[in-house]
From Swiss-Prot:
Pfam families: ATE_C, ATE_N. One of its GO terms (biological process) is ubiquitin-dependent protein catabolic process via the N-end rule pathway. This is Aspartate/glutamate leucyltransferase. The keyword Acyltransferase applies. It comes from Granulibacter bethesdensis (strain ATCC BAA-1260 / CGDNIH1).
């Protein structure tokens, strides 16, 4: 798809109010948001994705937090990606698992797995309280080409699911969840490895992973998938060890427990 054509209607962007950051304690987040609608939705989504935006329903958003640049857009350059010994082991462990690319239609089977994952991994988060109607909206409210990658074992049991957008230069992992009772399978890692392989098989150069946030237990893992690229000062460039060290320093906790109460971490 060629998205170089001009958009024939104005695009409006809005800034949200401040709210507690879901990734780093003691920080506040703000977002810039815009609606993805109309005949140019695919073109707009492609452009916004390359500019560091993410999609939720028919909304594209990006962080604009005052005094904080912790959320770094990251993508894997799949043609240069190489399997480590650990990742080969993960693939072998899941040799009997098959991936199916299915339409973005919510099922109760998916939702039951989604609930188990949320309660186990993110029990204190807003998504843990989602009902089936909310889950269906997350999956099906999309103005662009979206599907679900389902991972099933040899008994056809659903082990993992990844809501996935298709861009003109890659795949975008919107949200993934998996069986929390099978840690030996490393299903989260296996899903990423499978998506890397799928992206490459489709002749596309990038797998977009969303935001990398150093020192966040939810988001820090993404820098381990290299070679990767990050969006820095408006341009994509290779992620370096210096970037990782710099982000780890910038995202260290603002508050930490001490014997006398709380410390600001500024000593």
């Amino acid at each position: 798809m060629n998205d170089s054509k001009p958009l024939y209607r104005p695009q409006f962007f809005y800034t949200t109010g401040a709210s507690p950051c879901p990734y780093l304690d003691g920080r506040m987040e703000r977002k810039v948001v815009t609606e993805i609608t109309g005949p140019d939705a695919e073109t707009l989504h492609n452009r916004l994705s390359r500019a560091g935006f993410r999609r939720s329903h028919n909304i594209a958003y990006a962080p604009v937090c005052q005094g904080c640049n912790a959320c770094v857009p990251i993508r894997i350059a799949v043609n240069d990606f190489r399997l480590t010994r650990t990742r080969r082991r993960i693939n072998r462990t899941n040799a009997g698992v098959e991936m199916f690319d299915v339409p973005a239609q919510a099922t109760h089977e998916q939702f039951m797995l989604f609930q188990r994952y949320q309660k186990s991994r993110h029990g204190d988060g807003d998504m843990a309280a989602m009902g089936f109607t909310d889950y269906r909206a997350m999956v099906e409210d999309t103005p662009i080409q979206t599907s679900i990658l389902e991972f099933r074992d040899q008994d056809d049991v659903l082990l993992c699911a990844c809501l996935t957008d298709r861009l003109n230069d890659g795949l975008s992992a919107v949200y993934s969840f998996y069986d929390p009772d099978l840690p030996q399978r490393s299903l989260g890692s296996y899903a990423i490895l499978s998506m890397v392989a799928q992206t490459k098989a489709e002749g596309l150069p990038y797998l977009y992973l969303g935001y990398w946030v150093a020192n966040s237990r939810k988001m820090a893992y993404k820098s381990a998938y290299q070679p990767a690229e990050i969006l820095s000062r408006g341009a994509w460039r290779p992620l370096t060890q210096a970037d990782i060290e710099e982000q780890e320093e910038q995202t260290r906790p603002l508050f930490r427990p001490s014997a006398t109460g709380f410390s600001t971490g500024q000593e």
